[in-house]
């Protein structure tokens, strides 16, 4: 008869332990109920990007001296720089500059090492297209000023996200 009593005691202890575990999980679930949702309705709401965000590269044609430092520091040798040597003035003249954003890894080395600061990162991150060949930007497309999210009146910008507490 004693083994039956000990089995009931073990069963009771296991039941209490299971109820405690379920209660702990339920309390964690309830603690998340008072937090704000993290979901952002993307096309209508956008986050303000940070100051050091690595978006589309902006290129200023007039500042470039065709030194090709950007090509040397790029881990995938991506920027294509075409230039012609002007023998009378002994300087390089830039003819064409292009970057294929379908291949670019947005590491920012070209921007960081450019001696004339003709390259800069923008806050523009919407680069999706239906054809991958449209992602090959020449100097005209790279020179286009980025559209600021803050200036667009049709989009509600979200400045502060609720911090996720762990």
From Swiss-Prot:
This is NAD(P)H-quinone oxidoreductase subunit I, chloroplastic. It comes from Lactuca sativa (Garden lettuce). Belongs to the complex I 23 kDa subunit family. NCBIfam families: ndhI, NuoI, PRK05888.1-3. Its main location: plastid. Residues 55-84, 95-124 form the 4Fe-4S ferredoxin-type domain. It holds the Pfam family Fer4. Its cofactor is [4Fe-4S] cluster. Coiled coil: none annotated. NDH shuttles electrons from NAD(P)H:plastoquinone, via FMN and iron-sulfur (Fe-S) centers, to quinones in the photosynthetic chain and possibly in a chloroplast respiratory chain. The immediate electron acceptor for the enzyme in this species is believed to be plastoquinone. Couples the redox reaction to proton translocation, and thus conserves the redox energy in a proton gradient. The lineage of its organism: Eukaryota, Viridiplantae, Streptophyta, Embryophyta, Tracheophyta. It is a peripheral membrane protein. It is an enzyme of class 7 (translocase). InterPro entries: 4Fe4S_Fe-S-bd, 4Fe4S_Fe_S_CS, NADH_quinone_OxRdtase_chainI, NDHI. PROSITE patterns: 4FE4S_FER_1, 4FE4S_FER_2. [4Fe-4S] cluster 1 binds at residues 64, 67, 70, 114.
């Amino acid at each position: 008869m004693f083994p039956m009593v000990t089995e009931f005691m073990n069963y009771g202890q296991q039941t209490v332990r299971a109820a405690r575990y379920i209660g702990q999980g339920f309390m964690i679930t309830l603690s998340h109920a008072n937090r704000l949702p993290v979901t952002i309705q993307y096309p209508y709401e956008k986050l303000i990007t940070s100051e050091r965000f690595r978006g589309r590269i902006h290129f200023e044609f007039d500042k470039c001296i065709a030194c090709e430092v950007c090509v040397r520091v790029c881990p995938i040798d991506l920027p294509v720089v075409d230039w012609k040597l002007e023998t009378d003035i002994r300087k390089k003249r830039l003819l064409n500059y292009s970057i294929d954003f379908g291949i670019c890894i947005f590491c920012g080395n070209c921007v960081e090492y450019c001696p004339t600061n003709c390259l800069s990162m923008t806050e523009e991150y919407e680069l999706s297209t239906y054809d991958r060949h449209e992602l090959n930007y020449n100097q005209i497309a790279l020179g286009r000023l980025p559209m600021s999210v803050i200036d667009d009146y049709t989009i509600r910008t979200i400045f502060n996200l609720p911090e996720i507490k762990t």
